[in-house]
Structures are given as structure tokens and as C-alpha cells.
Design a protein with these regions (language model features):
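Accessory beta->alpha helical hairpin/"wing" motif in late/C-terminal subdomains of nucleic-acid enzymes
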Residues: 80-84
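Amphipathic alpha-helical dimerization/coiled-coil segments
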Residues: 86-111
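Beta-hairpin "wing" of winged helix-turn-helix
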Residues: 57-74, 79
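Short, Lys/Arg-enriched N-terminal segment that forms or immediately precedes the first helix
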Residues: 1-5
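N-terminal helix-turn-helix DNA-binding core of bacterial DNA-binding proteins
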Residues: 6-48
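Basic amphipathic alpha-helical segments that dock to polyanions
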Residues: 49-56
Length: 111
């Protein structure tokens, strides 16, 4: 089943911060890891990801650094900051409340 993009767009920052909370990653790695962890349900385009990462860097939720990849090319990695971890915790709480209330309204989990 295909998921409406508008459902994903509001949760994308939380998903990216969650990925970065486990390890530093470069852009394409985030795209593939998000797809893998969601069993190919979430497909993030690089045209969506990089502006988001730029905004997150501006907000001091992530920092970036360049390093040389095994193939010799330069690769830009992103790392979550302490402020980003706080934001992630806030977004997770917000998501928990939101998903509980949507489920309640839809009648899921009730007898």
C-alpha cells in the first residue's frame, strides 16, 4: 500500500534525527537506511532530504563534516547534536500522543 506523502512530510525530521541518533550518516545512506528500516514503505528523495538537512544544520540539530570515502571521493557526513537529541525526544513524545489520539478517534484498539 502506498502512503500519502503528506503523512510522511511532518515526521521526516524526526525520522532523520532518529537515524542520526544511532550513527553519523551521509545523505544517500540516510535515504537507503530509511527505506530499509521501513520495509521499503518510506522513500525519501534527495531533493527533499538535503534542504531538510540544511535547515536542521541551521537550527543546530545536526552538524556536518567531510571525510574521504574508501573510493577516494569526499563525502559529507551528518551528526546529531545535543540540541538535536532534545528535539528528537520532543518529536517522539509529540508523535506518541498524536498516534494515540488518531487511533482513538479511528476506534483502533477499542472493543
Amino acid at each position: 500500500m502506498k502512503i500519502d506523502k503528506s503523512l510522511l512530510s511532518g515526521s521526516t525530521p524526526m525520522l532523520i534525527l532518529s537515524l542520526l541518533s544511532t550513527q553519523d550518516m551521509y545523505g544517500y545512506e540516510m535515504v537507503t537506511e530509511l527505506s530499509r528500516r521501513s520495509d521499503d514503505t518510506f522513500h525519501l528523495k534527495e531533493g527533499t532530504l538535503y534542504p531538510l538537512l540544511h535547515t536542521m544544520e541551521k537550527n543546530n540539530w545536526v552538524t556536518s563534516y567531510n571525510t574521504q570515502a574508501p573510493n577516494g571521493r569526499e563525502r559529507k557526513y551528518y551528526r546529531i547534536t545535543p540540541s538535536g537529541r532534545e528535539q528528537l525526544a520532543h518529536k517522539e513524545e509529540e508523535w506518541q500522543l498524536f498516534s494515540e489520539k488518531v487511533s482513538t478517534v479511528l476506534g483502533f484498539g477499542t472493543i
